[in-house]
Amino acid sequence: MVQRLPLKHSLGVISLLGLLLFACSDSNVLLDETTSFKEDLGWVQKQPIQFALTVEDTLSSYAMYVIVRQNNAYPFYNLYFSPSIIDGKGKTIQKGLAETILYDPVSGKPKGDGFGDIYEKKFLIYADLKFPRAGKYQIQLEQAMRVDTLAGMVSMGLLLEKRANGKN
């Protein structure tokens, strides 16, 4: 015979589990966000993706990863984009050009992990990023391919992790 807990005890157990999950979250993650594109549109070149964050620890280094998700409608084997880091006063403190290979150029086989016709690839773009001062920042990703609208793009994500003892 199974003995059931009264409702108030069940709520207590559920609350405790929720608290434990929250306490076990990764404190080294400063930002972990994803922006999805409209399915029928893709990534429009003149519409950069923006991520907002607040930096308090300026002594630590951070690793910045981009997570690209695309489907079989993506027309190229690679992706060029421009990541920018903008401080709270609107000044660009870092800008670059990044490329990732999404499909093998010879075989056409997708790189990264896939499920159905959607593939995901995570890659490092900055290994030792430092912020000059505490405050609000914006990270912007601009599509840099030679087409106005990039079909087949599902989403772009950004993961910013504090490096432990100088390493991730």
What are these regions (language model features)?
Residues 59-62, 123-143:
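Short tyrosine-centred short linear motifs in exposed loops/low-complexity segments
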Residues 25-28:
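Bacterial signal peptide processing site
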Residues 2-14:
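Bacterial N-terminal signal peptides that target proteins for export
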Residues 132-148, 152-162:
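Internal, hydrophobic beta-strand segments that form the core of beta-sheet-rich folds
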Residues 75-81, 152-155:
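Short coil-to-beta strand junction motifs in C2/discoidin
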Residues 66-74, 145:
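Short amphipathic, basic-aromatic surface patches that mediate peripheral association
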Residues 47-48, 98-103, 110-125:
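A beta-strand/beta-hairpin structural motif
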Residues 20-23:
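C-terminal motif of bacterial Sec signal peptides marking the signal peptidase cleavage site
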